[in-house]
Amino acid sequence: MRARLPLRWLLPVWLSACAGSAYRVNNEGRLFGRTGNTVWVQGPWEAIQPSRDVDEVIDQLCPAIMKLEGAAANDLGQEYCGAIYSLGEGVYYASHGSPLGKTVPVGSTRRKQCTPPSRVVDARGRTSTLADYHSHPWAPSPLSIFDLKNDNQLWFIRIQFDRGCTVMKYLPYRHAPRPGEVYVRRNGTWILMGLLESDLDKDLGVVTPVEAK
């Protein structure tokens, strides 16, 4: 007969399986969904005030996302992905966050990884996407090689933030003959932290640190 595992051993597994599940069940097909292998998200997200200054939108994202299920649950947590977009009138909006993606191992635990959206749906009109954003449920968490590789870039800007609300920005310049740029948000200012100096660096996600000024 197989021994029964103590409840305290099963609790982390149960939490991992449930992180973000109610949010997904209640909102899939309404606030986010799949079209084939891609993910779409609905906007605007009422929790984020729109602005003509995209940084004002970015600064609201982390506090709002961290209120969602599992968003700050460390290795047992849930990533959320979304987009920043406009309707062509010079005002930027944020979409709802999507938990859709795959579950990946992190050490001895498992984490739910989100897929950046390929499309934003807004009933008011045609959308133009500027950036994708995603959260990490632990801290500190810098941009990874996966986050930086050229093949994984969908838009002009990539925003990432961790559970401590350290916000990173990547300008990939995927089709331009200039370095990719990695920034961190500090006291309302973007500080340059690293460069992806060559096309090969951008393909591989290799960052050369720069001295912060």
Label every model-predicted segment.
Residues 21-24, 114-213:
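Active-site-proximal loop/helix of nucleotide/amide-processing enzymes and allied scaffolds
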Residues 2-6, 109, 156, 183-184:
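Intrinsically disordered, low-complexity sequence elements enriched in Ser/Thr/Gly/Pro
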Residues 1-16:
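Sec-dependent bacterial lipoprotein signal peptides
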